[in-house]
Curated annotation (Swiss-Prot):
Name of the molecule in the record: Ribosome biogenesis protein YTM1
WD repeats: 98-136, 191-230, 271-309, 312-351, 357-397, 403-439
GO biological process: maturation of 5.8S rRNA from tricistronic rRNA transcript (SSU-rRNA, 5.8S rRNA, LSU-rRNA); maturation of LSU-rRNA from tricistronic rRNA transcript (SSU-rRNA, 5.8S rRNA, LSU-rRNA)
Record localization: Nucleus, Nucleolus; Nucleus, Nucleoplasm
Keyword GTP-binding: no
Record's subunit section: Component of the NOP7 complex, composed of ERB1, NOP7 and YTM1. The complex is held together by ERB1, which interacts with NOP7 via its N-terminal domain and with YTM1 via a high-affinity interaction between the seven-bladed beta-propeller domains of the 2 proteins. The NOP7 complex associates with the 66S pre-ribosome. Interacts (via UBL domain) with MDN1 (via VWFA/MIDAS domain).
Homology family: Belongs to the WD repeat WDR12/YTM1 family.
């Protein structure tokens, strides 16, 4: 080591399964992330190296220690507290699934299939070999979102929401080959007088929440009643002509299927004063929503009451994702930010520590079950960004799903892969730890 090299006192901490003994280390200030990661691995004597990133005062270290200290005014006599976290592998494209229509929502939660909904009103299922195993016309207008209610072997009960002013409960069977797959609309949910923007099933699959541009949130059970709970709407001459066209056009979805039971809501939640853009479950009895009225609201679903309102000045919200364990919510808005909120208070987790800037409007956000801190956003500039909420200055990684200016409209992050939906169809990328994605990666790469 060069005698002129200075050292910095460092204390390490971590929330990973790889803690170091509590002691002070004298680290050469010329060291970067790679050197620190080597130090941790050697000190722990790990049989298989584990790559780490390092957080210094809420910022991921991307320079030498000396450069970081100079930029932040930290002297050599001070002791740096550095937290290390497991590194996220560089994003790697696994597969692409072309669509003729824009993809509005995507799910990576099924072990053997990817699900998408699109602006043509269809729900589609793809196996890991990129085969279409189901193509179901469910709605007569673009589907805005969907949620898996329950499953048994290859049969799934799903809920969908649409711009056709309705939501639905459907049952699908995913078979091999496609001819053995099937779908059936079980019930249509009738409440809203404007497009239904989102739908969410609770973890037990017993209740649903719907949000709409009419400012209302509907609470529904998922049982299918023996008879209709809502009268059939009056059909005008124009509606009759449209219905006749649908009978001869199998590609047109029809939420008014004669076999579907018309359901009424259990409760209607009222508090928003503008479009509600997204709703989600926070607990078995609590919901959370965001809207164009620049508010984030929590709900006591059983009592039908708004329990907390978080207001943000001129910040119309487009999407949200919740972390149930931490009782936090991440929102994306038209002011080109993602913001982290503690739902136990009425404020963001401080303006400095809670906002994540984007160069273009972020349209969607998703958390991952594998981490309490990692999150992915998709934006109208076509860029997907992976973040660690402990570091607000820059994304961990970013990549373009498609060439050109195609917008990202939906993201999902499960089992170490990110599903990306939008104007370019569906793309699936490997983003995560090696052991999370190994099996899926091999299967997807064989089919690429």
């Amino acid at each position: 080591m060069d005698a002129s090299t200075s050292n910095q006192a460092v204390v390490f901490s971590t929330q990973t399964p790889y803690p170091l003994p509590s002691q002070k280390y004298m680290i050469p200030t010329t060291w970067r992330r790679y050197h620190l990661s080597q130090l941790v691995n050697k000190a722990l004597g790990l049989a298989k190296p584990v790559p780490f990133d390092f957080l210094v005062k809420g910022e991921i270290l991307r320079t030498t220690i000396a450069e970081w200290c100079a930029e932040n005014g930290v002297g050599e006599e001070e002791t740096l507290e550095i937290e290390y976290i497991e590194s996220v592998l560089p994003p790697q494209r696994l597969s692409e699934f072309p669509h003729e229509s824009w993809v509005s929502a995507v799910s990576c939660s099924l072990p053997t299939h990817f699900l998408t909904t699109a602006y043509d009103g269809h729900l589609r299922a793809f196996d890991l070999s990129k085969n279409v195993t189901l193509d179901a016309a469910l709605h007569s207008a673009p589907i805005t979102s969907f949620s898996v209610i329950s499953s048994t072997v290859d049969t799934y009960k799903l809920a969908t929401s649409s711009l056709d002013l309705t939501a639905q409960i459907s049952e699908i069977t995913l078979g091999e080959p496609q001819s053995s797959s099937s779908n059936k609309v079980l019930a249509s949910l009738h409440l809203h007088t404007a497009p239904v923007s989102s739908i969410a099933a609770n973890p037990s699959g017993t209740q649903l929440l719907t949000s709409s541009w009419d400012s209302l949130i509907g609470v529904w059970d998922t049982t299918i009643p023996p008879k209709h709970e809502v009268p059939e709407p009056t059909i005008t001459a124009a509606d009759q002509r449209t219905k006749k066209r649908r009978k001869v056009d199998p590609s047109s979805g029809d939420s008014s299927s004669p076999t579907a039971i018309r359901k009424a809501p259990l409760t209607v939640l009222k508090s928003h004063i503008g479009r509600v853009s997204k709703v989600a479950w926070l607990s078995p009895t609590q919901g959370v929503s965001c809207g164009f009225d620049s508010t984030l609201r929590t709900w006591d679903v059983e009592r039908g009451l708004c329990t907390r309102t978080i207001s943000a000045s001129e910040k119309p919200f487009l999407d949200l994702a919740v972390n149930v364990e931490n009782q936090t919510a991440l929102t994306v808005s038209t002011d080109r930010t993602m913001t982290l909120y503690d739902l136990r208070t009425e404020e963001a987790l401080s303006a400095a520590a809670g906002s994540f800037l984007h160069p273009a409007t972020p349209s969607c956000v998703a958390t991952t079950p594998e981490s309490s801190y990692q999150v992915v956003t998709g934006a109208y500039d076509g860029v997907v960004r992976v973040w660690d909420t402990r570091s607000t200055k820059a994304a961990i990684s970013s990549f373009k799903a498609w060439d050109g200016t195609k917008k990202v409209l939906a993201v999902d992050w499960k089992r170490g892969v990110i599903g990306i939906g939008g104007e370019g169809g569906l793309d699936v990328w490997k983003v995560g730890l090696e052991n999370e994605t190994q099996g899926l990666s091999k299967e997807s790469q064989r089919s690429a």
